[in-house]
Amino acid sequence: METDSIDSVIDDDEIHQKHQFSSTKSQGGATVVISPATSVYELLECPVCTNSMYPPIHQCHNGHTLCSTCKSRVHNRCPTCRQELGDIRCLALEKVAESLELPCKYYNLGCLGIFPYYSKLKHESQCNFRPYSCPYAGSECAAVGDITFLVAHLRDDHKVDMHTGCTFNHRYVKSNPREVENATWMLTVFQCFGQYFCLHFEAFQLGMAPVYMAFLRFMGDEDDARNYTYSLEVGGSGRKQTWEGTPRSVRDSHRKVRDSHDGLIIQRNMALFFSGGDKKELKLRVTGRIWKEQQNPDSGVCITSMCSS
Amino acid sequence: MDLDSMDCTSTMDVTDDEEIHQDRHSYASVSKHHHTNNNTTNVNAAASGLLPTTTSVHELLECPVCTNSMYPPIHQCHNGHTLCSTCKARVHNRCPTCRQELGDIRCLALEKVAESLELPCKHMSLGCPEIFPYYSKLKHETVCNFRPYSCPYAGSECSVTGDIPFLVAHLRDDHKVDMHSGCTFNHRYVKSNPREVENATWMLTVFHCFGQYFCLHFEAFQLGMAPVYMAFLRFMGDETEARNYNYSLEVGGYGRKLIWEGTPRSVRDSHRKVRDSHDGLIIQRNMALFFSGGDRKELKLRVTGRIWKEQQQSGEGGGACIPNLS
């Protein structure tokens, strides 16, 4: 739900566009599943909820197993044989699980690791091959996939603007700047250096103070994100504020990055000052640049940032 | 326990001047093919790498009391401590691990885990390269070609096992068995009281030829109700290799002759099994006494024999074949 839509216009100003480098990474390979481990792994699946079981694993007198969560729901009756459950533990299966090693569930996405059963979930929650969540903030979008899929998803399903280039110049216009409480979101995707970057712009309450924030997220993993640096700049009427930092991986959620204040934060009074005029309308022009860390940028005079707060 | 000790006079190539005309001259062909391919010492390093999973799961399938492998039904207490069926019957409903009441609880999960387990043969260190499902492992191990051999000495309940060179030394040093080299033999068996057949007696001689070892057995036993003497040959090695050889045993006297020709049995087959299958030269007591001559008061049998390899074309020359009159 957008009230007073923010208009994003790219102007051909004196910003010098660098040409982009295109590099494509390919991941391949799949792990062969060890068949004895597979059938033992099936034994570790709760017959009721089909989730993996973890200690304490329960069983009935006949040996039918059950996870702790389901045991508390079945009212002391075995779901398999209807016998009384009692309070019997299947210690043997817990020990079998200790000695079990299994491939990561993302092995078909390229992960070659094999992990002890009791470490598998932890690894999978941070596996570099796990699919990415949709970076579109606002709607609770549950889409997941690889970067290529998500870029198409952002373009086709969320109608996000797509741009190519390492520099950008955005104008954000809002007719009623007082309504900061209702956070609004603006997302633009940039393609440069063969990668994709998400530029976020939004308004939110920082403590009790209304602020606007712009920040960049890298569509990929944290390790790759660290190869890049970006700057964001806003100003007007003799004032300028610049943020320079490293893009955050989309592995970190939008809210996490926002709440860590990792980006350009503009207090509302300064935003109105930058907008000029009669302080009735928000007009911000945010310019920015993305570069690779290994390169030595030797262009332009660096104007020291005068930050008035 | 020897009653009226049987005197075995082993004379190689001895010809007695009796009226029996020995037409065939014995071949003293001692061909020593030293095949050093004893399978028992051929340790195949091809025992495939064990999954850490397999080893530690296998330990879970060991009964904590008797340390034998457990098979269904596997029992447990409320706390999950497992126990085999045999030990459960002995522990009077008290868990040996935590002293809690056992009850009647089955560890079905561990039984199913065992189904999916594959383990190397326990004779892996003796050369067996194979891996088997848990529930098939014991069966294989009883027939594995790499399993150690039992002592072929019959009579005493000798429980010694080992490979063939070890057992040959054991027979010579511990059982004082006569050792001979050569492919032909000529044995005299003398017993002063031939009536006592009920108490079986045993005589064992080991022959070394073709680079292999053969056990010649001679004994007396009741065949049904009839007292008989029997001589047979066993090969110190496996059945498949024993089939490469043939042997003959011959006994006779006074115009009669009995000849047995056959294939040696592997020492994998026990002495009793071979005897009870009648696979050898069987002499009824009345014929044995006839062959012994004299006043039928004393047993005097001369058994001659020969071992040859099947692949060889043994052109047996000479001698009229006298049909066996029984």
UniProtKB/Swiss-Prot annotation, chain A:
Changing residue 49 to S: Abolishes ubiquitination in vitro; acts as a dominant-negative mutant. Residues 96-289 are annotated as: SBD. The keyword Cytoplasm applies. Its EC number is 2.3.2.27. Pathway: Protein modification; protein ubiquitination. One of its GO terms (cellular component) is cytoplasm. InterPro entries: 7-in-absentia-prot_TRAF-dom, E3_ubiquitin-ligase_SINA, Sina-like_RING, TRAF-like, Znf_RING, Znf_RING/FYVE/PHD, Znf_SIAH. It holds the Pfam family Sina_TRAF. A zinc finger (RING-type) spans 46-82. GO terms for molecular function: transferase activity; zinc ion binding. SUPFAM superfamilies: RING/U-box, TRAF domain-like. Zn(2+) 2 binds at residues 134, 141, 153, 158. A zinc finger (SIAH-type) spans 99-159. Gene3D superfamilies: Apoptosis, Tumor Necrosis Factor Receptor Associated Protein 2, Chain A, Zinc/RING finger domain, C3HC4 (zinc finger). Keywords: Cytoplasm, Metal-binding, Nucleus, Transferase, Ubl conjugation pathway, Zinc, Zinc-finger. It catalyses: S-ubiquitinyl-[E2 ubiquitin-conjugating enzyme]-L-cysteine + [acceptor protein]-L-lysine = [E2 ubiquitin-conjugating enzyme]-L-cysteine + N(6)-ubiquitinyl-[acceptor protein]-L-lysine. Zn(2+) 1 binds at residues 104, 111, 123, 127. Induction: By auxin. Induced by salt stress. The keyword Zinc applies. One of its GO terms (biological process) is protein ubiquitination. E3 ubiquitin-protein ligase that mediates ubiquitination and subsequent proteasomal degradation of target proteins. E3 ubiquitin ligases accept ubiquitin from an E2 ubiquitin-conjugating enzyme in the form of a thioester and then directly transfers the ubiquitin to targeted substrates. Mediates the ubiquitination and proteasomal-dependent degradation of NAC021/NAC022, a transcription activator that functions downstream of the auxin signals, thereby acting as a down-regulator of auxin signals. Involved in the formation of lateral roots. Homodimer; homodimerization is essential for its function. Interacts with UBC28 and NAC021/NAC022. Interacts with SINAT6. Interacts with ATG6 and TRAF1A. Interacts with WAV3. Interacts with FREE1. The RING-type zinc finger domain is essential for ubiquitin ligase activity. This is E3 ubiquitin-protein ligase SINAT5.
UniProtKB/Swiss-Prot annotation, chain B:
It is found in: Endosome, Multivesicular body; Cytoplasmic vesicle, Autophagosome. The keyword Plastid does not apply. PROSITE patterns: ZF_RING_2, ZF_SIAH. Induction: Induced by drought stress, salt stress, osmotic shock and abscisic acid (ABA). A zinc finger (SIAH-type) spans 116-176. It comes from the Eukaryota. Pathway: Protein modification; protein ubiquitination. SUPFAM superfamilies: RING/U-box, TRAF domain-like. Zn(2+) 1 binds at residues 121, 128, 140, 144. The RING-type zinc finger domain is essential for ubiquitin ligase activity. The SBD domain (substrate-binding domain) mediates the homodimerization and the interaction with substrate proteins. It is related to the TRAF family. Belongs to the SINA (Seven in absentia) family. This is E3 ubiquitin-protein ligase SINAT3. It comes from Arabidopsis thaliana (Mouse-ear cress).
